[in-house]
C-alpha cells in the first residue's frame, strides 16, 4: 500500500497521524461501551465527499500510504497513562488499548463511481474499527490541501482567528461564554490544528473550554471533551431489542456504563420529535443535557427547554451543547438567546481548524451497517441523512413517525 515514489524513511518524516490519540474523545467513550456491551458487533462504514467537483484520485497512493502507516501505530505508555487518568475510563479498557492497533485488512481504498471520486470502506469488528474514522478523514483533508494549497496564507488564518476571539474578548457581556475546538476531522493540517489550540488556550483564558482532540488536550493541558456520536445510536438499531426502542436502549446502556458521567445525549439521529418522545422524565433528570447537531438551533433549544419544564427538570441546571456548523457570530447569538435560562456550550470545528480563505472539504465517514443490517441517521437536516438502503430508511421513518423524505 506504500506509495511507490516515496521511500519509507522519507514517508515516516511526513506522516500525518503519528499517534492513535490524534482523534476525538467520543471515539474512546463509545469504544469503551462497545468493549463492555457489544464486543462481537460487526460494522461497515462508508466515506462520502459532499463537496462537488473535488478530484482526489491523483492522491490515492498518498492516502493509502498514510493509512498504511496509521495501521502500524500503537499506544505509548505515556498515552495509556493519560487515558487511565480520565475519571470515566476504566482500567480494563486501557489494558485492551495497550494491545490495540488498527487492522489494515479492514479498510479498503480505491476509485469511486463518479469522476474524481475515491471510495473508502471500513468493514469488520466494531471494537477494532471504531478508531478509523477521524484519522482517515484528517488524512484525506491534509493530503488534499498539501497538494492543492502548497503555500497557505498562515497570516490570513491568524488574523481570522484573532478576529473571532476578539468578538468574545471585547464584549464584557460574554463573561460566561465557553467555546471548545471540535475540528480534527476537517482540519487544514495537524500543524495548523495545534496552533489553533495553543493560541486559544493562551489568549482566551476561561472562555476556552477545551478540545475534542485527545492528543492536543494531553500536550497542552486542556480538557478533552466529548460524549457520544451518531454511530452509537445508529448501531443500536441493530443491537437493541427492537427498532422502535433502539434510542431508549442506547441511552439506557450509556447510563449503565457511565452511571451519570458523560451525560450529554445526542438528539438528531431520528430528529427532534422522535428524540423528545423517547427522552422522558427519567432521562431528563438523569442526563446533564443534550447536543444539537442539525436543524434550527434556536427552535431546538426552545423546544428542549420547554420539554425540561414539562418533565419537571430545571432547565437552569441543564447544558445545551451546540455543534452544528457553528461560527463565532452564530454561537454568540445563541449564547445571548439562552443566557440565564440554561447552561450553554459551543463546539466549533471547521470554522476554526480550516478557515484560511479557501473552501473546506465537506467529507464524512458514516456507519451504514451493523451485524449485516442497514442502519441510518435521519437528522433534522435532510442533506445529512445517510443510508444505502431506501427500503430500510422508509421503514425507519414509519417506525419513528417521521415525515417522508
Swiss-Prot record:
| InterPro entries (UniProt xref) | N/Namide_PRibTrfase, NAPRTase_N, Nic_PRibTrfase, Nic_PRibTrfase-Fam, Nicotinate_pribotase-like_C
The record's section on Gene3D superfamilies has: nicotinate phosphoribosyltransferase
Look up the record and name the pathway of this protein: Cofactor biosynthesis; NAD(+) biosynthesis; nicotinate D-ribonucleotide from nicotinate: step 1/1
MF (Gene Ontology): nicotinate phosphoribosyltransferase activity
Recite the UniProt keywords alphabetically: Ligase, Phosphoprotein, Pyridine nucleotide biosynthesis
Q: Which GO terms describe its biological process?
A: NAD biosynthetic process via the salvage pathway
What processing steps or modifications follow its translation?
Transiently phosphorylated on a His residue during the reaction cycle. Phosphorylation strongly increases the affinity for substrates and increases the rate of nicotinate D-ribonucleotide production. Dephosphorylation regenerates the low-affinity form of the enzyme, leading to product release.
- List of residues that carry Phosphohistidine: 230
Say what the protein does: Catalyzes the synthesis of beta-nicotinate D-ribonucleotide from nicotinate and 5-phospho-D-ribose 1-phosphate at the expense of ATP.
From the Swiss-Prot or TrEMBL record, give the protein name: Nicotinate phosphoribosyltransferase
Q: Which gene encodes it?
A: pncB
